[in-house]
Amino acid sequence: MRAGRLKVRRYKTRRHSPVWPILLGLLALGCAAFWLLRDTDAGAFLRFTPALSPQDRAAETRTLVLPGKTWYALQLGVFEDTASAGDLAESFRLRGAAGYIARREHYRVLAAAYPTRADAQAVQTQLRTQHQVDAYIYEIPRPEITLRLTGQRAQLTALSDAYDALDQAAEQLFALSQAIDQGKEQDYRAALTSTRETATALRGRLAALFDAPPQAVQQVMDLLQALADGLEQAANAQSAVRLGAQIKYCQLLCAVGMADYAAALAP
């Protein structure tokens, strides 16, 4: 059988407050949705792969929870057009900021992502007093999503691993960014290579398990590919400033990407 389109059933639940973070977070909205595939829909999700063991080919139903998460971003500017946003983003990349452009109602240029508002406020103050740069704290919320999926064991495991890897990458890249900004000695490129190889391997697993990936799976594959590409650019950076900027960019890529992914499935 070939992989088809996933069917989504959403249920309303309570909502939390949202978030996401040169040297700077992300989103959180906290609602919960349920993505349900009935047993009769299993064939739409499954593709039997001869290379898999009988256990991995077996159909099962599993509940996956994508937890809510809020990052706090320092926003440098908001624009109606991409050209203006791009110009500002590049000017700040040269100074070590991510220069990440989030397409949210308008084009928002973000400098970095922080796990707490206090962290973002500390850098916001530093930018204003030491560099005469005004930045706005922009919250990017990610809703909590509960997914009840039916598919091959190998498919469900690969998807769960991809969710975990993208969240872990955002946290690890934040830690790397902080270390670089503080001038700590560390083997940055080894860490970047490890994360890039993980993203590439997970994308390959998902591609091998789905003939025609459902949209929800394809979005994860695209995000993993974008992360791998971004990390390769970071590894090839020719200066510490460019390295720090690209690491912040990749962190925001994960944080914003997963927030948008969860929000699309929320009720």
Where are these regions (language model features)?
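Alpha-helical segments in soluble extracytoplasmic regions
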Residues: 154-230, 257
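Solvent-exposed beta-strand motifs enriched in subsets of small alpha/beta binding domains
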Residues: 22, 42-151
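Short charge-dense sequence patches
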Residues: 35-38, 69-78, 176, 207
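Low-complexity, intrinsically disordered/propeptide-like segments
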Residues: 9, 39-40, 234
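Extracytoplasmic/luminal low-complexity segments enriched in Pro/Gly and acidic/polar residues
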Residues: 211-267
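A detector of long soluble domains/segments in diverse envelope-associated and cytosolic proteins
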Residues: 134-140, 161-164, 168, 239-249
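N-terminal Lys/Arg-rich, disordered targeting/topogenic segments
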Residues: 1-14
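Hydrophobic membrane-insertion alpha-helices, especially the h-region
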Residues: 19-39
